[in-house]
């Protein structure tokens, strides 16, 4: 109903609309906040247009105001709070979309760092820090630097923090987003078909920045930290070669069998770095494997975790927000596929169970933390006539963060 109405309004170039659909009874989904979020997200998704680089803007710019009718003052207060929360979420989703849709010559690692700095300057509850390659060398981030060495664009390591107004003594939630702003595959070069879409390989980083913006507006009572390793993956005379062995920040050695498995290389150093925050939970988000697209298509994000409670919470948030995930196993048998005769591990484990073996690799850097991995290779963007970023999994992440804040408040009461 909502999608049909929104498409009709857009086609008629109507700028404002009044909603009464939120009064409709929905079985098992009758909460006001859920209805407002669902309606506003659907309308926003249809109204969204990415035309930053169009010299002639589209005539139909879509509507820009949605009004919800209320019965009384009490309902109005609830509606106002719901609208503010929903507005924050939509702004976060749109930021994630805009970042991912920008071309790789614009959205470089430096650009991601600049956006993070801008967010901190515009929001008093956000702070940011950007590490340069020299800093990464001092931290011995050999895995991340093995990817960036093939590009003339300097890598950036971004830390962005949200500080709650009245934080509890509980630990923060940490989000780690893969920020490969263009992925050619490196020396293990990808085929040319569809390579333009490899600008979307920073979808994890976009989701982290979008989530941090949303959180800064919604202001849940929980500290959140975003960590983004940002780089390009390109081939030149200095690029890593298949067979190279590097030492990660954790001290573990990695045999690089495929330079196109670079996402896990930059994430492993980011995960090792994030351990210093002693997080309650750490969630990495990455367009990591084509195998996940084969397994789950474009509808469900792949979820793998070493913690059942964290996994169940994310699955619940995915269902509640309409941004669903499906859990895959991390059984010991799969770990054997990434064994190396020359190093502590290999960065790939063959064609079979590619999504799982990639997560097995990451799990070796999260042994002391409750950790979840979200593989968004199938859900971060769409191809074809609807080509463009989706903003996922910002809705799931924001819902999870809000639910953890509410859980803590209940515990303290």
Feature names for model-found ranges:
Residues 1-179:
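Short amphipathic alpha-helical segment within the helicase RecA-like ATPase core
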């Amino acid at each position: 109903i909502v999608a049909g109405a929104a498409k009709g309004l857009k086609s008629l170039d109507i700028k404002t609309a009044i909603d009464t659909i939120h009064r409709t009874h929905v079985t098992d989904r009758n909460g006001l906040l859920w209805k407002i979020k669902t309606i506003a997200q659907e309308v926003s998704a249809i109204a969204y247009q990415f035309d930053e680089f169009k010299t002639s803007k589209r005539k139909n710019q879509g509507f820009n105001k949605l009004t919800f009718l209320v019965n009384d003052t009490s309902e109005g207060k609830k509606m106002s709070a719901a609208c503010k929360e929903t507005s924050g979420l939509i702004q976060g989703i749109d930021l994630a979309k805009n970042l991912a849709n920008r071309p790789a010559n614009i959205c470089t690692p430096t650009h991601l760092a600049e956006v993070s700095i801008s967010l901190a300057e515009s929001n008093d509850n956000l702070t940011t820090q950007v590490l340069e390659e020299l800093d990464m060398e001092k931290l011995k981030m050999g895995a991340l630097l093995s990817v960036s060495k093939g590009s003339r664009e300097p890598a950036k390591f971004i830390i962005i923090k949200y500080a709650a107004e009245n934080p509890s003594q509980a630990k923060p939630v940490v989000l780690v987003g893969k920020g490969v702003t263009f992925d050619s595959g490196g020396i293990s070069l990808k085929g040319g078909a569809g390579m333009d879409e490899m600008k979307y390989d920073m979808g994890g980083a976009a989701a982290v920045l979008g989530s941090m913006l949303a959180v800064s507006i919604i202001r849940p009572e929980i500290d959140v930290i975003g960590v983004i390793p940002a780089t390009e993956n390109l081939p030149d005379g200095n690029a890593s070669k298949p067979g190279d062995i590097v030492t990660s920040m954790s001290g573990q050695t990695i045999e690089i069998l495929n330079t196109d498995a670079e996402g896990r290389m930059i994430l492993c150093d980011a995960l090792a770095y994030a351990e210093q925050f002693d997080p309650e939970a750490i969630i990495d988000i990455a367009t990591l494997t084509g195998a996940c697209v084969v397994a789950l298509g474009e509808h469900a994000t792949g979820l793998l975790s070493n913690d059942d409670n964290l996994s169940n919470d994310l699955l619940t948030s995915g269902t509640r927000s309409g941004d669903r995930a499906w859990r895959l196993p991390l059984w010991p048998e799969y770990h054997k596929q990434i064994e190396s005769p020359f190093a502590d591990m290999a960065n790939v484990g063959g064609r079979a169970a590619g999504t799982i073996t990639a997560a097995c690799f990451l799990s070796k850097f999260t042994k002391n933390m409750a950790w979840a991995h979200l593989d968004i290779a199938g859900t971060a963007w769409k191809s074809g006539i609807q080509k463009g970023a989706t903003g996922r999994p910002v809705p799931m992440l924001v819902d999870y963060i809000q639910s953890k804040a509410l859980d803590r408040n209940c515990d303290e009461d």
